[in-house]
Amino acid sequence: MTTPYLFEDSESFARKLDAEDALRGYRDAFHFPPGPDGKPVVYLAGNSLGLQPRNAARYIQEELEDWARLGVEGHHHGRHPWLHYHELVTEHAARLVGAKPLEVVVMNTLSVNLHLMMVSFYRPTKQRFKILVEAGAFPSDQYAVASQVRFHGYDAREAVLELKPREGEETLRTEDILETIERHGHEVALVMLGSVNYLTGQAFDLAAITKAAHAKGCFVGFDLAHGAGNLRLSLHDDGPDFAVWCSYKYLNAGPGALGGVFVHERHAHTKDLPRFEGWWGHDKQTRFQMGPTFSALPGAEGWQLSNPPIFQLAALRASLELFDQAGMAALRAKSERLTGYLEFLLDRLPEGFVRITTPRDVKQRGAQLSLRFRGEPQGLLKRLGDAGIICDFRKPDIIRAAPAPLYNSFTDVYRFVKTLEGHARE
């Protein structure tokens, strides 16, 4: 246990922490599903699908009304003209990931954006053709990387280089990542890692990895699916070439929601960087002249293909406004304390009942703790559900619990662990 807080194992202490929480009011900005008893559930699955912001339905309804009232004229008129609607979330998203607005665009979904970024930043040569990834990355990332390698005529078994934990360990050591880059960097075209591993909950040192990879001449990209809205990110300063993320997890924009893209400012005006092109990435001043020659917008917007879905943007806007109001510094501070309290309580359960596989160092994790339990985990998951507690299961034997600082409370964490304790003592 490495958290610097003094905690107590009592419901009164959990309620005291909630009363002192400056962010507690944001909980009321979300809809909580009812549990079996009709009361709001303890929802610890924001790392899988975030809760619905109360403003989401209103924002979507506004656009439905403008569509009914204006038809095609809604692109230029209405409360929020659709032609520029995506720009309403650009600055919010940029602050969220520590970037400049020029470097960020909201579009598509994560796997689509990852492919678009690899078109530009995976440029294999005979000597430098490998992609460095983490073993056990989210499957869609694995599929995308392997298919890009095959598209360029290489065998994925030779061109995909995996980072694996040491024998007997479950997470990667930063020094091992950096040593692998130093040893193999001359043959690596792209370093492509997650910011937080979806299964272990381990967060990586983006700045150190980027610096090491750039020193060896590699492009660098990150999947922020479990980082955006969870970690305090500094993409511009850390300097990766690109990053992609989804917004249905910690960003609470709904199932299948739009993703985001970061392209570093140094590439903003690079005309000869290959990319797939579409009309929405064309210069706004001449887009509707419908000319035959593509002229890319500067920055991340130049990678857009199509005009974005307005209703999805409306849902995302409802959530990003809350993040902007709360601020990632305050949210991350609460998150460290909230997950630290979860860790403290789990450590007090009967010995051998549960093992935390996520790093104990708060700098190497976000909100999520990945848990391995003695016995069959899916039965325990059902018991939690029957008690009005929602977390999720990942094969082979991991239950993930992720208290989200925007809407979870210390009492939520206490109730979760006390339910586990009842199961452990039976």
From Swiss-Prot:
Binding site for pyridoxal 5'-phosphate: L110, S111, F138, P139, S140, D141, D223, H226, Y248, W279, N307
Functional description taken from the UniProt entry: Catalyzes the cleavage of L-kynurenine (L-Kyn) and L-3-hydroxykynurenine (L-3OHKyn) into anthranilic acid (AA) and 3-hydroxyanthranilic acid (3-OHAA), respectively.
Cofactor list: pyridoxal 5'-phosphate
Pfam families, per database record: KYNU_C
Record-listed E.C. numbers: 3.7.1.3
Keyword list, A-Z: Hydrolase, Pyridine nucleotide biosynthesis, Pyridoxal phosphate
Top-rank taxon, per record: Bacteria
PANTHER family named in the record: KYNURENINASE
Pathway as given in its UniProt record: Amino-acid degradation; L-kynurenine degradation; L-alanine and anthranilate from L-kynurenine: step 1/1; Cofactor biosynthesis; NAD(+) biosynthesis; quinolinate from L-kynurenine: step 2/3
Listed GO biological process terms: anthranilate metabolic process; L-kynurenine catabolic process; L-tryptophan catabolic process to kynurenine; NAD biosynthetic process; quinolinate biosynthetic process
One example GO MF annotation: pyridoxal phosphate binding
Encoding gene, per UniProt annotation: kynU
Organism in which the protein naturally occurs: Myxococcus xanthus (strain DK1622)
Top class in the EC scheme: hydrolase
InterPro entries: Kynureninase, PyrdxlP-dep_Trfase, PyrdxlP-dep_Trfase_major, PyrdxlP-dep_Trfase_small
Protein name: Kynureninase
Modified residues (N6-(pyridoxal phosphate)lysine): K249
Gene3D superfamilies documented for this protein: Aspartate Aminotransferase, domain 1 (3.90.1150.10), Type I PLP-dependent aspartate aminotransferase-like (Major domain) (3.40.640.10)
